[in-house]
Amino acid sequence: MPATAYERVVYKSPSEYHYMKVCLEFQEHGVGLNVAQFKQLLVSALRDLFGEVGAALPVDVLTYDEKTLSAILRICSSGLVKLWSSLTLFGAYKSKKCAFRVIQVSPFLLALSGNSREQVLD
C-alpha cells in the first residue's frame, strides 16, 4: 500500500483591500443612524475587541443607506478578520440590542454589485 503525500497550499490574496457589504439590524424598529454615527459604531466595535490597535485600522465607508442601515466597507486585507470578528461580536448601541449581518465579502468591489443568489433568470 503506497503512502499518500499531502501538500498544504495556502492562498494569500494579492489584493490590498477587501470589500464588505454589511447591514445593521436592531431588535427595536425606528433606530436611525447617519453615516458619521455608523462609522463611529465601526470604530467602537473594533476598539471593544482589539483596543486602540483595532480602532486604528483604516476602514472606509464607501456607500451607506440610512433607510436600510446597510453599507459597503473597504478594509485593508490584513485587517479583514479583525473587522469581521468585531462586527460579529458587537451586540448593543446606546443600550439597544443590535447585530451586524455580513452579506458579502470580496477582494473585488465589482463583485458586490450583484448577488447570484438573488438573480432572476428569464
Curated annotation (Swiss-Prot):
One of its GO terms (cellular component) is multimeric ribonuclease P complex. The keyword tRNA processing applies. Its main location: nucleus. It holds the Pfam family RNase_P_Rpp14. The keyword Metal-binding does not apply. Belongs to the eukaryotic/archaeal RNase P protein component 2 family. This is Ribonuclease P protein subunit p14. The gene is Rpp14.
